[in-house]
Regions:
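Surface-exposed loop/turn motifs in large extracellular/passenger domains
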Residues: 1-192
Length: 192
């Protein structure tokens, strides 16, 4: 779906294939590009999706979540084909959330890096705001991350034209702006 407004429930889905862009496109997600004003509940996802060369707000599940509660559980990656990359606001699950809360649990991103591809960036931005789970959580409401494994490379190539290029990179969340509580438990981040 390109976008949703209101409540959405999606269960038991497999995402495969690839999407390629030439430094254009925004609000791009494996399931939803843009989600607004509701509760989005997406569960039991297996993916080997590859999104390459998009501009901004790119996620393996949803590109941009606004004014919502986003729930994602049982998200599994067990293939070296998985890759999410673009210019800015890049995340394995969500590129950007704004004025939203999230509950993300039971995530396994297991893209094992071999010696041969040790320099490959799997979840990356050419500019900024990139996270293993969410690229940017702005004005974040109370949220949680639990039972999360991110075993892959996350980074920025720092080749963007923005003066802040290469900033805001995180194993879980690239950038988070909130005065609310975010519970994080049982998480593991590794590049190997």
């Amino acid at each position: 779906a390109g976008s949703s407004s209101g409540n959405v429930t999606i269960d038991n889905i497999t995402i495969s294939g690839s999407m390629s862009f030439d430094k254009m496109g925004e609000n791009i997600g494996g399931i939803l590009g843009y989600a607004n004003n509701g509760v989005q509940k997406i569960t039991n996802i297996t993916t080997n999706l590859s999104i390459n060369g998009a501009n901004t707000k790119v996620g393996g599940v949803v590109g941009y979540v606004e004014n919502s509660t986003f729930e994602c559980s049982q998200f599994t990656v067990n293939t070296n084909q998985f890759a999410i990359n673009g210019n800015s606001y890049i995340g394995a699950i969500a590129g950007k959330t704004y004025n939203s809360g999230f509950s993300i649990s039971d995530v396994s991103i297991n893209h094992i890096m071999t010696e041969q591809d040790k320099d490959v960036l799997v979840i990356y931005a050419t500019n900024q705001f990139v996270g293993g789970i969410i690229g940017c959580a702005e004005q974040c409401k109370e949220s949680s991350l639990s039972n999360v494994l991110v075993r892959t490379s996350v980074g920025s190539s720092g080749t963007g034209s923005d003066s802040d290029t290469g900033k805001y990179v995180g194993g879980l969340i690239g950038y988070c702006n909130t005065s609310n509580k975010i519970d994080i438990c049982d998480t593991k981040i590794s590049s190997q």
